[in-house]
Amino acid sequence: EARRQAGMIRRQGERLKSLVEDLNLTTKLEYALQPICRETVDLVEIGRQAVSEVLNSGLPEQYEIEFSEEHPGRAARTEGDAALLRRMLDNLIRNSIVHNPQGCHISVKVGAEDGRCACTVTDDGVGMDAARLEALNQEADVSSTQGGEHGLGLKLVWQIVKAHGGTVRFRQVGPHGLGICITFPAYNTR
């Protein structure tokens, strides 16, 4: 019993630490206080790292997560801050977990085509109603969110994407579930 309680306290402490870090980061991004360390980054590698980290952190058995490359062998590079881009993907994956306590299948797909890199995170969870999806697709709505059901994590995602010159689209997947597609300008390595 003591071990179970200690584990619960540890997990809650990690969650609180993560929330404080997200709050600090979103404030820094909002007021342009967060330096963006721009370098050529491989979004395929960042996607693999984000999925591996979630799997290695003890993903509960009611969740499945998979990673795939849209076009294997084709570079998916952009100019950006690797740590922030990884944080963005981590937030999207964890958003699927938090909002689907019954479990779900999560798919992370990365690729490049037509001068753009794309990161897509989908789940077959409970999804969202059409009005909320439409509101999330309005940057002002997400940027003005002050916490709430889909608040700080998605606000942080929007801010990271905006800082990298990207776009975000939220959509319904299948009969239920959520899909988020993020695109960035591709970095030409020629």
What are these model-derived regions, one by one?
Residues R11-L16:
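Short alpha-helical segment of the dimerization/phosphotransfer core of two-component systems
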Residues Y31-I36, A75-G80:
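Conserved micro-motifs of the catalytic ATP-binding
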Residues C37-S52:
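A conserved beta-strand-to-alpha-helix junction within the catalytic ATP-binding
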Residues M128-D141:
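Short conserved segment of the HATPase_c
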Residues S96-I97:
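Short helix-loop "hinge" at the ATP-lid/N-box region of the Bergerat-fold HATPase_c
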Residues S57-S68:
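Short conserved segments within the C-terminal catalytic ATPase subdomain
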